[in-house]
C-alpha cells in the first residue's frame, strides 16, 4: 500500500509522517517518497495547503518580534482544532505513533524562519522571547522574559517614601497619567526608579525586592540601599548602565542586569544614626549606660513571634540636655522607633535610661549585605541582543509599546 493511499497529502506532511530525520527536511523527503513524475496535489487532507506556503502565510505574523531585543526564543503554535484532529486521525489509522506532529513541524519551521532572519537561537529552557503563533487567524503573541536589575540607591532628600502608592487615577492598573506604571512616579523611591527603568527598557512595569526599608523622612547614604527590580514586558535587554544615575534626590549606583530575583530572606547589616529625645534631662552617667548596647542582642516581638537581632556596635554624642544621637551597626530588621520608645523591643532605650524616650528620626549611613546574600546573581558577559526581523518597506507600523 502506498503511504498516502486513502489520503491526499502535501510533500511536507508526506515526509513528516512517513520519513525520518531532521524535521526541517520533511518537504524534501516528501518529494522523494512521492517519486519523480508525480504531480503535487493542489490541497492536503491534513493541513489544507498550510505547510507548503507556511513562510508566506504565517511569516508576517512574526514581524512583531522586531519590537523586541533578544538572543534566544521559542515558538509555540495554536492550530485549528479540525486540523489537529485530522493529523491525529491519519497518524492513528496508519499507526504512525513515532511520526512528528503537525504542531511540532510548524513550530520548527517558524523557528527556523525567525532564526534565519534574526540570528537568534531557539532555547526551550529560558528563552528571552516566547512567541505563540496562532494559525487560526495568523496572529502572534509575544512574551519577553522579565529583565532583573540589581543596584543600590542613595536618598539625599527627606519627604520621599520608599514604596510608591498606587496611582489615584487607575488604582494601580496603569494609565496615561502614571505612564502605565500603576504608581505615582514622583512621590516615592519606587516611583522614581520605576519611571527610569521602565523608560530605559520600554517595560510595562516593575516589581521590587528591597533590602530593608526606611521612613519617608530618612536619608540613605554610604554606598546606598541594595534593591532588585523585575521589569515586566521589556522590549530591550542587555544594556550597560553608567556607574551612577542621578534622578533628583535619588541616585542609583552600580545598576546591572542579573540572572534572577534573590533568594529570600536577604541577611544584611545597617549603620544607622538615630536622633533621640528624652522627657527630661539626662545625666552623663545615665548616658554612659548606652555603652552596654554594643554586642548585645535585641528581642523583637511581632505578635507571638520572637526574632533576635544583634547590635554589633554602638556609640553616642550629646546634642542637648535631654537629647543625643545614637550611632549603631545592627542586623537588618530592627524597628528603630519601637527600639527607642520601648514597644515590644527588649532591651530598649526608654528602659535602659529610665525615662520616656522618643525617636525624632533616623538616617542610614551604610547598608551591607552579608557574604553570599547579595540580591541577584551577576550575569555573564553577553552580546547585545538582536532585534526581530526587519519589517519590509511599506509594511504595517510596529505595535505601539505600552
Curated annotation (Swiss-Prot):
It is an enzyme of class 5 (isomerase). Residues 380-389 have a biased composition (Basic residues). Residues 370-402 are annotated as: Disordered. Its EC number is 5.4.99.25. The keyword RNA-binding applies. The active site is at residue 215. The keyword Isomerase applies. Keywords: Isomerase, RNA-binding, tRNA processing. Signal peptide: none annotated. Responsible for synthesis of pseudouridine from uracil-54 and uracil-55 in the psi GC loop of transfer RNAs. GO terms for biological process: tRNA pseudouridine synthesis. It holds the Pfam family Pus10_C. It catalyses: uridine(54) in tRNA = pseudouridine(54) in tRNA; uridine(55) in tRNA = pseudouridine(55) in tRNA. GO terms for molecular function: tRNA binding; tRNA pseudouridine(55) synthase activity. Gene3D superfamilies: 3.30.70.2510. Belongs to the pseudouridine synthase Pus10 family. The gene is pus10. This is tRNA pseudouridine synthase Pus10. InterPro entries: Pus10, Pus10-like, Pus10-like_C, Pus10_THUMP_arc.
